[in-house]
């Protein structure tokens, strides 16, 4: 039986006989064809950038300025707004034109990348080694591989510095902690102290420690990008100028599939970190655009009812709840005054609408009685009703909505998708690392194509 993929219709270099890989193995057919593999990668970049541009314009077309971004299911406009484009005090969108420009620029770029991808996949030289030796490579060439690694690191470093320059010189970025409820501002005094910045890496990942995810001021974030950008650029230069040391030559597997597995592992780690960042961090991901974090929504509900009942005459400092603990306020394990009730589990939340009400020992009773501002009440009521939760129970006491309410927080989408993708990339890492190590050790067998069970079965037709 002849199919499109195993008969005379197949092009040489794309069929199983000439490459050793079936059609569905994708780029594996191009392992030794550097020109064609370049085409596949450039075309893939074109698809990615096309999605970014098209989705960007789709979100602009559907955007309603009267509603917060997180109520509209947006995931790209919040990123642009966080970079300070088109927004003003309180995260209010003043101008959607920068978002339109972003979408169009990505679409134009994707056309260029798409053309380059098709050119290199179909028309360009199959291999680059002969005509363009700078761009050519052999997977086993350790020196060339570390040079390519160095170039990638320099490009990543430049990317980190682009954010730094945007924050310092080109209009600034959105700071959710700006007084009065957030605003766009230029970052002036960067944190460059290594003890502070690398201290984040040494913190525990649990509770109020929160590892690097606990960063809560833009000076630290932008200063961290200065350090990271510098490390990437200098590390890139170092990798270009040096050859791998003997221990690295011995310890690592030097093949295309091994490099794929290393990359998948790195992206998996990035995915898990991004998941935690978007779920817990309301500085890098301001709640004005992404909606409140889970702990933030829970604390906002406690705050909203404290405000309500205090107006109705409750003494919030001494009222007892059903468990004998404070109904509105209680003490944390370390003695701070915190919100009572089920939200006690989130007592280490920090949020811009709540911090002005804290004193040296936690929430300040006199400020809660005299200093609560209308914008704090409005924001907490809004956050209370937009928790990033699709759960029916055990949600920190937050009143969950009935099924008729059509709201899913972008935090839920972004955290869940990055967790799932991070997990699958990790599985991909294990798979390709195992294959690469087996091939290097010389016992890679694969499926025996000569005695595959399906070959002895009656054809379907």
Curated annotation (Swiss-Prot):
Residue numbers carrying Phosphothreonine: 3
InterPro entries, sorted: PS_antenna-like, PS_II_antenna-like_sf, PSII_PsbC, PSII_PsbC_sf
One Pfam short name: PSII
One GO BP annotation of this record: photosynthetic electron transport in photosystem II
Cofactor binding, per record: Binds multiple chlorophylls and provides some of the ligands for the Ca-4Mn-5O cluster of the oxygen-evolving complex. It may also provide a ligand for a Cl- that is required for oxygen evolution. PSII binds additional chlorophylls, carotenoids and specific lipids.
GO cellular component labels: chloroplast thylakoid membrane; photosystem II
Protein's UniProt keywords contain Chloroplast: yes
Membrane topology: Multi-pass membrane protein
Pro-peptide positions on chain: 1-2
Main location: plastid
Binding site for [CaMn4O5] cluster: 355
Record key words, sorted: Acetylation, Chlorophyll, Chloroplast, Chromophore, Manganese, Membrane, Metal-binding, Phosphoprotein, Photosynthesis, Photosystem II, Plastid, Thylakoid, Transmembrane, Transmembrane helix
Subcellular location: Plastid, Chloroplast thylakoid membrane
PTM annotation (N-acetylthreonine): residues: 3
TM region positions: 57-81, 122-143, 166-188, 243-263, 279-300, 435-459
Subunit and interaction comment: PSII is composed of 1 copy each of membrane proteins PsbA, PsbB, PsbC, PsbD, PsbE, PsbF, PsbH, PsbI, PsbJ, PsbK, PsbL, PsbM, PsbT, PsbX, PsbY, PsbZ, Psb30/Ycf12, at least 3 peripheral proteins of the oxygen-evolving complex and a large number of cofactors. It forms dimeric complexes.
Task of the protein: One of the components of the core complex of photosystem II (PSII). It binds chlorophyll and helps catalyze the primary light-induced photochemical processes of PSII. PSII is a light-driven water:plastoquinone oxidoreductase, using light energy to abstract electrons from H(2)O, generating O(2) and a proton gradient subsequently used for ATP formation.
Family assignment from sequence similarity: Belongs to the PsbB/PsbC family. PsbC subfamily.
NCBIfam families attached to this UniProt entry: psbC
Designated name of the protein: Photosystem II CP43 reaction center protein
Species whose genome carries this gene: Trachelium caeruleum (Blue throatwort)
Lineage: Eukaryota, Viridiplantae, Streptophyta, Embryophyta, Tracheophyta
Gene that specifies this protein: psbC
